[in-house]
Structures are given as C-alpha cells and as structure tokens.
Amino acid sequence: MHVTLVEINVKQDKLDEFIEVFRLNHLGSIKEAGNLRFDVLRDENIPTRFYIYEAYVDENAANTHKQTSHYLKCVEQLESLISEPRKKRSFIGVMPEIK
C-alpha cells in the first residue's frame, strides 16, 4: 500500500472555496480503481490547515491518480487558495494488509 500525507495551508478568506474545489477532487479520487482511502482532514487547532490522507494499492496507482483530470484541475485551482506550497510525505502502508 502506498500512502501520501499532504499538508495544505489555505488562505483565511478562501476556506469555503477550498472546500468546494477539493470536494470535486475527493469525489473523483474515491472512484479510482486503485484508491483505498482519500480522507480530507481539518486541523482542530489551525482551522486553515488541512491534511489529505491518500492510500492507493501501490505507487503505480498513486502516480495514475496524479494524471487524472480531477487531480490536475484541483492542483491548478489550489494555487490561488493556498498560503504556501503543499507539503507531501510518502509512506509504505504496513497495516491493514492488502490481500
């Protein structure tokens, strides 16, 4: 399992727009064949900070995600909504095991 954790810091006055832009990416992502999870989380202490937890069956599926129209459109639209570049960390999922 290939997991990516993305931190996104949104401009205070762009929160509602961010939610709508990211909702479309979320809805497209959860329909992808290799997607296991695509969670959008909001920091309870910093309301302008979001974390995206993406789990795919393997790195190839994660890379395929980055070529989808919903992902590319989201990345383009995020540029005017975020206060700093996105931060990404990749992980190898150990549990649960994929069978």
Curated annotation (Swiss-Prot):
Residue span, ABM domain: 2-91
Keyword Isomerase assigned: yes
GO cellular component, one term: cytosol
EC primary class: isomerase
Molecular function GO terms recorded: (4S)-4-hydroxy-5-phosphonooxypentane-2,3-dione isomerase activity; oxidoreductase activity
Top-level taxon: Bacteria
Localisation per UniProt entry: Cytoplasm
Keywords from the UniProt entry: Cytoplasm, Isomerase
E.C. code: 5.3.1.32
Presence of keyword Isomerase: yes
Main subcellular location: cytoplasm
Catalytic activity field: (2S)-2-hydroxy-3,4-dioxopentyl phosphate = 3-hydroxy-2,4-dioxopentyl phosphate
Matching NCBIfam families: PRK10486.1 (NF007791)
Function description: Involved in the degradation of phospho-AI-2, thereby terminating induction of the lsr operon and closing the AI-2 signaling cycle. Catalyzes the conversion of (4S)-4-hydroxy-5-phosphonooxypentane-2,3-dione (P-DPD) to 3-hydroxy-5-phosphonooxypentane-2,4-dione (P-HPD).
Assigned protein family: Belongs to the LsrG family.
Quaternary state and interactors: Homodimer.
Protein name: (4S)-4-hydroxy-5-phosphonooxypentane-2,3-dione isomerase
